[in-house]
Structure formats: C-alpha cells, structure tokens
Amino acid sequence: MSADENRSETHGRIKALDGLRAIALLLVLFYHCNFTFLPLHGGFLGVDLFFVISGFVITRGIWQRLEDKTFRIADFYQARIVRLYPGLFITLLATSIFAWLIMLPRELASYAQSLYSTTGLFSNFYFWRHSSYFSPSVDYLPLIHTWSLGVEEQFYLFFPVVLTFIFLARKYTTQILWVFLTASLGVFLLLASNYPVITFYLLPFRTWEIFVGVLLSRYIYRNHTTTSQNSSVADAVAGISLLGILAITIDYQQIAINSTYLQLVTVALFASLLIFLQHAKYLQAILANNLIQKIGALSYVAYLVHQPILVFLRLANNGKISNWQRFLALLLTFAMAEIIWRGVEKPFRNWARIAGSDWRVTSVFAGGSALILLLGFTITNSNFAFHKYTVAEKKILSFTDPSYVISYEYGKCFLGGAFAAGNVYNNCFSQSPAGTGTFLFGDSHAAMVAVPLKESQNNFSFLAHSGCFALLPSRLTVPVCDSFFAYELNRIEEQKPERILLGGNWLEGSLGTSYGEKILSKSLAATIKKIHQIAPASKIYVIGQTPEWSPNLPSVMVREKVPLQDGQRVSVENFAALSGIDARLETVAGQNDATYINILNSLCESSKCLAVVAKDGVNQPLVFDSNHLTQAGEFKVATIIQAAIS
C-alpha cells in the first residue's frame, strides 16, 4: 500500500484518489478491529483496492516523465525511499520497543524474524513460509500486514524497467499490458483453490490487480475529457459500483465462501468506479470532503501502525478486547499517523528535496535499515530481555514446540498439500474383514487423536488431511479436499467398517458466521446420509470441538500465572462460539442417526476448560498452540472418544 510520490493537485482526480484510499483504508481497519456491531468479513478486500490504486498512480507518474524525457530509474527508487521509508522506520522502531516490553521471549524471537524480513521488504515471503497450519494466530503478529508492502516493493523493482520498454513500443502498449494482466490472472485462478496461501502472499498472483490499475491509468488519461454532460450517468454508475464494493465487504461470507471470484468482482467494480469517477460530479464532491481527504492522506502511515496497536492491545488484555477498546485503537491509529506525518514524513521529504543527491537518501535508508536490524538482534538477545523466565515458565513454554505434530503421523497418514489417490495410502488402512474395524477421517483435529485411538482399537484405520473436513463438496470445501474425501468415501464403500469417526475443527469450518454454520450443518447432514447410503450398517460418530486459546495455551498460562499442575483450568474466550457450533452439529447428527461426541462437556465447566493434563506422571498443557493437542492432551481426549464408541 503506498501513495503517489507526486501530490500535485492539478487534476481533481488526485483528490478523488485520496478519497478512494480513505475507503480502502477504512475497510481494512474495520476488518482488523472486528467490531461486533459491524463485522466487515470482506474488509481485507481493501488491500486489493490499494493494489489497483498503486498501479494507477505509479503508471501515471512514470509515463508522464517518459513522455517528457525526464524519467530516471534512480530518481524513481529515491522517490520510493522518500515516500515509504520514514513511516516504516518509525513504525518498526516503535513496534520493536513495545514488543520488547510486552512480548514473551519466544514471541520476540518470532517477531524478530518478521522484523528482518520487513526491513528487507520481503515479509510476504516470510509470512507465506510461516503462516502454516500450526502457526500462531495472525491476530498476534504485529507485522503481518506488511506483506502487502513487500508485494508492492517487489513490483516496483521491475516495473519501471518493463514500462520503459513498453513505452518504446507505444503502438502496442495496451496489448502488452493485457498480456501481463491475463497471465497473472490465469495463474491466480488456476492455483487459488488448492494453494490459497501462496496466491495470497506472493507477487505473481497479485500482479493482475496492479495491472488493472496500470491499464486504467493509460485508458483514463488517454480518453479523458473535461465535459460533464454525462455527470448524472457517471454518478449513478460510480455510486452503484461503490455500493457494490461495500455490500460485498459487509456481507462477504453471506455471498460466497472461499470464492476467489469475489476478488474479481470487487476489482471489476473498483475499475468501473475509477472509470466513471472522472465525470461523477457529486461523488467527486463527497470524496473531496476534508475529513475523507485527511484520512486518505494519512492512509499509508495509518495502515502501518494499526496492526501493532491492535496486537499489543490484545496481548495486554490476554486476547480479550471490547468494542470501546477497539474504537480506542482506531483513534490511536489516526493520532499516531498524524504525529508521524507531521513529525517525521514531512520533515524527511523537505530534507530529501534539499539534499537532492541519490547517495545521501540511499545512505540514510541503509543506515536506518542497519539500525532496525541491530535493534531486532538486541531485543531478542536473552541478556537484554525485559521478561525473564522462571524455571517453571520455561517448562510450560517448552510445549509450544511444533515437533508435537510428529505424533500425528504427519506425512504418513496425516497429509498436507496436494493429494493423489492410489495404493500409496494402503498402510493407513487395516486389512480387517468387511464390516469390522474403525475408520477415522477429517483434518488435523482428527489426526491429533489417531495415535491413542489406534492403541486402544482393533483394526483401526486413519487418514486425514490438514484443513480438509470430512464433508461432501460444498461452498466450504476446496478441490483438493473434495478429491481427498471422495477417496475416503470409496474406502468406506469397499470395507464398510463397523464404526466411522468424523473429526474436524468445525468452528473454523463455519468461518465463525451464522451463514457458515448453516452451510456446515447442511453439508454434515448430507455427508452422514451419503455414508448411510454406501455403508448402511456402519455406526457414525462426529467428534466435537476441543477448547482453544489464543495465541496459544502455554503463553496464556505464563501470562496468567497458571501453574503446570494436573487439573488446572483456564478461561476460554470464545467458549460461546465453540459450544454454539457443538449444539448445532449435535442436533444435526441426532437427526441423521449419528452420534455426536461432545468433548467440551467432558473438559469444561462453564467457560473454564481443563488446561493441564498428565500422561505417565508428567503434566502437560492440553494443547501446544491454540487448539492442537499435546501428547497428554491426545490421550485425554481419546479416552473420552473411546468411552463414547465402546
């Protein structure tokens, strides 16, 4: 997300663009604040709008200078440093100080890695590699939002050169730009369903959005006229386009779940808005409002500072923040943006204008980057740690080691990534006679109880895939999971086991919305009916939710001073949502001749759930991250399941 380095207002369209920046920013802010009275489930689409705006503005600036024969690539990169670096430097500096004061050492170590990647402007690669299935909640990552900055800066590395060559072939400008856009869009559509993380974070799959802005820039300025004879029509079309975008972001999950095509619709509506906005008299006047203009002018810095503010607010309150605290974070975001703009960005630009030379600006950039890197190293050095662990706290936090996934048989019968049906998974299935044995299917929440169940069950079979629910294809599922479950259904039809267990993180599957719950309920009902059809004698069990804590249970225990003693309980913030999805799915299971195994009823008293359990005399937290069971937790939950199916 960035703004035009040339803030000339010789055209009213610049004011309109600031108004559009304000809209895009507010969508993102409200999405991350997650106000209970206004849940903008599609607010993240504001970043898509920023990509379009960036392509639009950057192309305009470069093309004008190419026509004037005044364009120098060195000048372009210097302008990028002057525009982007001061706000980023101050944000990283302040964020690092607060991280040192508030975060636990293990959290600091993760933060430092993201700090290094953000300083190098490749944080999108870092978060792509580390936003895996077992990564901490993004709500507790102060720099997660800088991925978009990484995408844009990587685009800026090659785009001036590309546009210069395109300028030399001006006769074919539009055709060449369409080739870039179509290639990126095609790859995005091809991979988005099966590889949503990589297509979210990496430039090749975002280039099409930026090139929409590039093409719009060339189209609008080539066809621009000063006439306003069609202003009424333009206002109507632009207004409808804007309302369409707002409707999508407000009711995103009501309209389409896991739909990459909704991105296309949003970008198309935004393109329509940009095209007609140049003649839309009344909408331009609205967007020229002083408050909207101010928000747009501060959009870059406000975007930078909002996520750290929200993260530290959550950490300081153990994840529990109210609507008024969210509103306070919103006000603080704009206050900090104004301070940074007046106290840092504006003076730095004035200095850069006076300094003139490339090497001075570059030297400041290099020196500041080195300072940030040194700061990151220093705050994560145990000798300088603000928080000192006790021996007991070190013991608790040792359970956050993701190596626990080894006990889930990851890579063997618990899969991730692409799925290819075949005999390669035969070892995951017992060779018991038809009509006997137990099958377990689902996502990681099925996998995490597989090992202890295998020890207690004769003729036990298990196959799971991360992020794949044991459900028939629906708007909640993706193609790789549909193929996976089709394979599972074939095995059920072949062997017709005595018992079939379906496990999943159902709350995540419903996306936390009432509409998602409706889709999930219908899908589960259809799945149970399908299994009854192909294996009429099989008994079907649906494994319920397990407790979850954010960002992870060991950190919550350390912050709340909970000792590692068997039987300790810790409050679950989203217990109402967990128990709500349990109640709904238990009804669905009962109505379709299946048994629902309610884990929460056995582990929780009201909203306080069992947080410490023992295995072989050793106490362990129930889960090692937010919701995946430790070895002791596996056996505890497996005991509940075993009692229900015996």
Question: Where would I find each of the regions flagged by the language model?
Answer:
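Extracellular/periplasmic envelope-modification machinery, especially enzymes
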Residues: S2-A3, Q229, Q254, A316-F327, ...
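Membrane-interface helix/loop caps of multi-pass membrane proteins
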Residues: S2-G356, G368-L374
